[in-house]
């Protein structure tokens, strides 16, 4: 039996199955392997207190607020006014109703390489709803539906390092003062909540922080999908994703109580998160607010506040790109929002190496090429062993064909004769496939690094404007309802795969031989949908592999065509 070819066919078949599974999820169907995909992204709540939804009276009405709509709790109608704060990185619109962040524009990130529009995370313009809200709960206290007064002050950072916005609201003798602090070159917004008890009795309010978002996902390729939805992190349970679908079905399983942690709303390349600064007990919740409207939040008790006393609770709101250089400074475990898949332990060192290479070369395209060469050098001995085995197999292919013909219909005798041939020619039938199998985790990890890294987004290289998008050199077309971009890299990929096929031993089975000839075309079509950075890696890797394999094959004396 040709074990190597069997293993390669298993890998190829599994790859096609995974692509079909991705297509099912892309079209809204259940996963072949996991059924409801959301179930695999949840952690069962087994610890004490994790199975109960926190009891709170956080206002559930969210989304765009008409100017004349009555405020819950018997307040008079509020007149909404938008206060805009501009820094070097963001432009934030904050509503005087609730002190709610209604719009957050990222000034350093465009929607696409061909667009002059900036990425907008928080937004309240239909059909998008994505908001950051905080307030008090536990009584008739100011919340994200209350009208706030704004203190005078500058709204432009200019040449300074910080800009502050101070807002206050009072209800039933309880005053809430919110202070937003924006800092230069930072996507973190510090939010200080000062609670003043102007009543004649003690109060025990809690501060809630929640992110509200519609359930819409960003446009993606059918060949790869990334997580969009809420997440909860605690030191005990680590990073827990919660899908919109699980919230819809009431099956949102995550930790409900902890003394630390944070909540986030994650999407491809970007994230928003509330991080309470104090380590004290808090509740975590996810819930459906309305049709296609969901929230993830935390409720942090402030403790008893005596009459005339003031207590404070500080928090940080991060809303920006998942740039690795910034994530570690936000909170413990915050780097986990950058999804490297199930081989994170390998992916992180790969990206670390890429960052250092990029610091020298200054371009992500050349960085990918340099990294490919580096990985190829690391695996050079394994690859050489694989190619030597394949070259020897190619030399004995005529003898193997004779054995198959001689013992046709007698598999036991045929296998015995094959093993005798391997022994005589000193060929290890697994010698060609084992080095390939060892390298597969590295290839998968690099795939996720290139897919998840916002650093590659809108990064140019030669004719390519965006390494995170497909190569569009020859234009874009719609074929059978699919948006297809035609570029030179997938074509080069097909050519390199065709050359590799010619260097490998020809399968004795005519059907297998024809399928092997079609594989370059099949894979090149797939790679038309893949990010240019990923295709660039495969093209360079194939060129290096062809050079190494050709040299070894020629040295051993096997035919090279």
Locations of regions flagged by a protein language model:
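Membrane-protein biogenesis/insertion across secretory and organellar systems
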Residues: 1-377, 559-561
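Core hydrophobic alpha-helical membrane-spanning segments
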Residues: 9-20, 443-446, 491-495, 518-522
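Membrane-interface amphipathic helices and adjacent TM-edge segments
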Residues: 22, 308, 378-443, 497-527, ...
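Juxtamembrane "helix exit" motif at the C-terminal ends of alpha-helical transmembrane segments
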Residues: 144, 358, 441-460, 466, ...
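Transmembrane helix interruption/hinge and helix-loop junction motifs
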Residues: 362-364, 525-535
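Conserved catalytic motifs of ABC-family nucleotide-binding domains
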Residues: 447-494
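Hydrophobic core segments of alpha-helical transmembrane domains in multi-pass membrane proteins
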Residues: 490, 533-542
